[in-house]
Amino acid sequence: MQHETHTHGINMSALGRDKQSLNLERETVAIEVPGLSLFYGEKQALYDVSMNIPKQRVTAFIGPSGCGKSTLLRTFNRMNDLVDGCRVEGAINLYGNNIYRKGEDVAELRRRVGMVFQKPNPFPKTIYENVVYGLRIQGINKKRILDEAVEWALKGAALWDEVKDRLHDSALGLSGGQQQRLVIARTIAVEPEVLLLDEPCSALDPISTLKVEELIYELKSKFTIVIVTHNMQQAARVSDYTAFMYMGKLVEFGDTDTLFTNPAKKQTEDYITGRYG
């Protein structure tokens, strides 16, 4: 399909990202998916999905409810292992190593591939203890190291200036948007390589959403980010690459501007112009 697509009012203005030189073929690959299928019991949820997630870019997964985008996201740190009857066929390579190989240290994998969920889930602890939680699990207890990690992670999550004078107050006293940025700080404190964001703004107001979107843009200089979103405006704003999924299959994957303005598949065009989904 060669003609330009009407984008149904989608604002394509990115958050200041440099879009000139995006080329999926030239990117360094962080996560390689060479043909992945997933089953819940007898029900197949993913069908032979193949894609390469580029390093230190933001990749968005879009598609209607139930299309498999969150299921695919959760395969990247094996969260689906926690679902009874879940079975994966194929491989996922994180920097060349199959994370589904026998003997894989799943706890270490989840440190390397951190995840933030839809609803902010701070622990009922102080702001400080939320941030250092993962470090303490690793046996790190030196105050100087923890203090430095708290400041680094909270600055990285654009929250330091708002909470630096109340680090020992309960995290539950923060606003929803602050709680979500705290959860991001807690996730990056253990210095993962990949950040998975499963609709991180769906429970937030517009101002908090904008702060998280700006944060995502800042974080990609250090982390590979994959975000699932129902909000196509958000995908257009924050991502470098977008994957459109439908009924468990990957329909189209490419740079975000091209996918939204000149999609290769009619199914993609129908979705982004609001004909279904």
From Swiss-Prot:
Keyword terms, alphabetized: ATP-binding, Cell inner membrane, Cell membrane, Membrane, Nucleotide-binding, Phosphate transport, Translocase, Transport
Short name of one Pfam family: ABC_tran
BP terms from Gene Ontology: phosphate ion transmembrane transport
Record membrane topology: Peripheral membrane protein
Subcellular location: Cell inner membrane
GO cellular component assignments: plasma membrane
E.C. number: 7.3.2.1
InterPro entries listed in its UniProt record: AAA+_ATPase, ABC_transporter-like_ATP-bd, ABC_transporter-like_CS, P-loop_NTPase, PstB-like
Location of the ABC transporter domain: 31-272
Catalytic activity line of the entry: phosphate(out) + ATP + H2O = ADP + 2 phosphate(in) + H(+)
PROSITE patterns: ABC_TRANSPORTER_1, ABC_TRANSPORTER_2, PSTB
EC category name: translocase
Key word ATP-binding present: yes
Binding-site residues, ATP: G63, P64, S65, G66, C67, G68, K69, S70
SMART domains given in the database record: AAA
Recorded GO MF terms: ATP binding; ATP hydrolysis activity; ATPase-coupled phosphate ion transmembrane transporter activity
Predominant location: membrane
Function: Part of the ABC transporter complex PstSACB involved in phosphate import. Responsible for energy coupling to the transport system.
Family per record: Belongs to the ABC transporter superfamily. Phosphate importer (TC 3.A.1.7) family.
Record PANTHER family: ABC TRANSPORTER I FAMILY MEMBER 17, IRON EXPORT ATP-BINDING PROTEIN FETA-RELATED
Record note on quaternary structure: The complex is composed of two ATP-binding proteins (PstB), two transmembrane proteins (PstC and PstA) and a solute-binding protein (PstS).
Descriptive protein name: Phosphate import ATP-binding protein PstB
Species classification: Bacteria, Pseudomonadati, Pseudomonadota, Gammaproteobacteria, Pseudomonadales
